[in-house]
Regions:
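Feature responds to low-complexity, polar/acidic, surface-exposed segments characteristic
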Residues: 2-24, 28-56, 68-88, 96-120, ...
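Tandem repeat domain/solenoid detector
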Residues: 64-66, 128-130
């Protein structure tokens, strides 16, 4: 079991929206990666200096494995480590950790039309695996994700 990160005081705070750095760290640790293998990886992100030290090797690992790709803006490729993460972004990253070949059922949630094209395949795969079940026939792809929701997702993926 890994020690929690991202909160100055040792409190879980499940209702708090999770930052991208916290999410990357949780997923990398859930994957049980040997982070020492990635210490020398060069990151292409123009905002790499904003990645907290406690999450740097996790971000390097996730980038090296093709799980984290970043986003582009006028300055170049960014990781936005300190920003919060949307449910669609998180589900895309979680989907990239999975083997291929899972069923990809049609999304029948009432807000399925709000799922970005780049996230749809990953989301369908997670629905097919039973990881994503929705709530009140909604998946809220553009809402932010809380620390508690991430813990529940990672537990469902065990």
């Amino acid at each position: 079991m890994s020690k929690g990160t991202g909160v100055e005081i040792p409190v879980y705070q499940p209702e708090k929206n999770i930052t991208r750095a916290e999410f990357f760290a949780m997923v990398a640790r859930w994957m049980d990666l040997d982070l020492t293998q990635y210490a020398n990886v060069e990151l292409p992100f123009v905002d790499a200096a904003s990645i907290p030290d406690w999450a740097l090797n996790e971000v390097k690992a996730m980038y090296s494995l093709g799980i984290l790709k970043g986003g582009a803006n006028e300055s170049g490729l960014t990781v936005n480590a300190l920003a919060t993460i949307s449910r669609a972004e998180a589900m895309t990253i979680l989907g990239r950790t999975q083997a291929k070949g899972y069923a990809e059922p049609e999304l029948t949630f009432s807000d399925a039309g709000q799922v970005p094209d780049w996230a749809a395949g990953y989301l369908r795969s997670l629905v097919g695996q039973g990881v994503i079940t929705g709530n009140d026939n909604r998946i809220r792809p553009n809402d932010l994700l809380t620390r508690g929701e991430v813990a529940k997702l990672l537990y469902a993926m065990l």
